[in-house]
């Protein structure tokens, strides 16, 4: 299964279409069971363009988009420079909370909810 992170930006939308095409080709030629399991919206900002792109992604992949979208947040960008993940660097930041909620959503989606302590 494939999990696709995608920025809510126009060029990322084009890249998502190319990736979907590549996955279809791999399925046809090599692995008929390969499929997209989830699409995660990342680097999301409260702009009209981001909202429009997110809406288009949701329309194209209605059962695959997992909430919440991960908001654009400086703490996420800082974490790798400190050599730690966001949940260590700034767990209470918007990005830290978004990734925690996303992990819980994915665990529920994959039937691992009994292993998640909310």
Enumerate the language-model features and the residues they cover.
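Conserved catalytic-core segment of NTP-binding enzymes
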Residues: 1-74
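Hydrophobic "lid"/C-terminal helical patch
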Residues: 57, 99-106
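C-terminal boundary of histidine-terminating zinc-finger modules
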Residues: 80-101
């Amino acid at each position: 299964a494939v999990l696709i992170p995608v920025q809510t930006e126009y060029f990322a939308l084009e890249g998502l279409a190319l990736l979907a095409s590549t996955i279809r080709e791999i399925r046809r030629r090599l692995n008929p069971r390969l499929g997209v399991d989830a699409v995660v919206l990342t680097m999301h900002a409260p702009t009209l363009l981001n909202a429009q792109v997110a809406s288009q992604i949701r329309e194209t992949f209605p059962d695959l988009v997992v909430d919440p979208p991960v908001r654009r947040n400086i703490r996420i960008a800082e974490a790798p420079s400190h050599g730690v993940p966001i949940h260590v660097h700034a767990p209470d930041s918007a990005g830290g909370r978004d990734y925690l909620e996303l992990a819980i959503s994915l665990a529920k989606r994959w039937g691992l909810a009994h292993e998640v302590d909310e």
